[in-house]
């Protein structure tokens, strides 16, 4: 936020995940800005204080694909990172088992360049304050950028994951391309500052569902592999894993889980842990 509080949203632009666009008191905050080479119009978290963010209410980001979820629109506030840590610790005490955290640093270089906000330092400080900055703590930190992870590697001991998009390259390293970084030589470089990669699902499973070489090459470099994002809807599935029906109809989720396991993936990002975890346990 503008007053340097870490909050949890899918991106810094707020209109997809909150009701900010319907708030007349914030109409003057709407602007168009360059977000890593794309011109985006909307309301941005870095222009709001936490007190202002507190007045907003969350809403479903993908209502066309998940119409059932809109019944929750307007019920919840935007959580801070500190509140999520507190929730995880409360659930640990309640359930008697460890609960992990997997925060992502979104647009760290852009936020530093445009707003002077150092989210790397803020997150490192928040992890230390929570007692979650050591190698044995159940925390991974992920980012799509190189230099922020390199800095974080010097500030905390928790494992770090370099996220990899479908195409292009990291925003903070204009001369690097993801394709080159996924070669054995590129993966060896990543291993100097990160503990794993979080690749786009299509880099791990081809369109026909067969595994690529990426997991094996990453493991050879000593890296974990956590692909993203396994979602239940046809819309997000590889062609071989789609069922008949509309884009929001369920795809072949259990088969996707099996293929990822066969590929050797060490974990997976999912919007549907209530479906994916049982599928893993059945195997």
Predicted regions mapped to residue ranges:
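Phosphate-group recognition and catalysis centered on beta-loop-alpha active-site segments
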Residues: 1-283
């Amino acid at each position: 936020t503008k007053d340097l509080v870490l909050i949890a949203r899918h991106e810094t632009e707020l209109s997809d995940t909150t009701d900010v666009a319907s708030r007349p008191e914030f109409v003057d905050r709407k602007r168009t800005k360059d977000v890593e080479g794309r011109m985006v119009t909307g309301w941005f978290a870095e222009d709001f204080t936490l007190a202002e963010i507190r007045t907003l209410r969350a809403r479903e980001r993908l209502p066309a694909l998940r119409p059932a979820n809109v019944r929750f629109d307007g019920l919840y506030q935007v959580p801070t990172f500190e509140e999520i840590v507190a929730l995880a610790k409360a659930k640990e005490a309640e359930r008697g088992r460890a609960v992990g955290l997997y925060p992502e640093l979104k647009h760290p270089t852009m936020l530093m360049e445009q707003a002077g906000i150092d989210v790397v330092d803020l997150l490192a400080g928040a992890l230390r304050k929570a007692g979650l900055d050591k190698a044995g703590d159940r925390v991974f930190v992920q980012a799509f950028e190189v230099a922020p992870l390199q800095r974080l590697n010097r500030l905390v001991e928790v494992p770090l994951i370099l996220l990899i998009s479908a195409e292009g390259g990291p925003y903070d390293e204009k001369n690097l391309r993801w394709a080159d970084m996924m070669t054995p030589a590129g993966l060896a470089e990543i291993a100097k500052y990160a503990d794993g990669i979080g690749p786009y699902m299509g880099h791990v499973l081809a369109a026909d569902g067969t595994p690529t070489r990426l997991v094996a090459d990453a493991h050879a470099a000593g890296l974990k592999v956590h692909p993203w994002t396994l979602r239940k809807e046809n819309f997000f599935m590889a062609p071989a894993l789609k069922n008949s029906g509309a884009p929001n109809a369920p795809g072949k989720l259990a088969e996707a889980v099996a293929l990822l396991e066969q590929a050797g993936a060490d974990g997976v990002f999912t919007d549907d842990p209530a479906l994916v975890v049982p599928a893993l346990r059945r195997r």
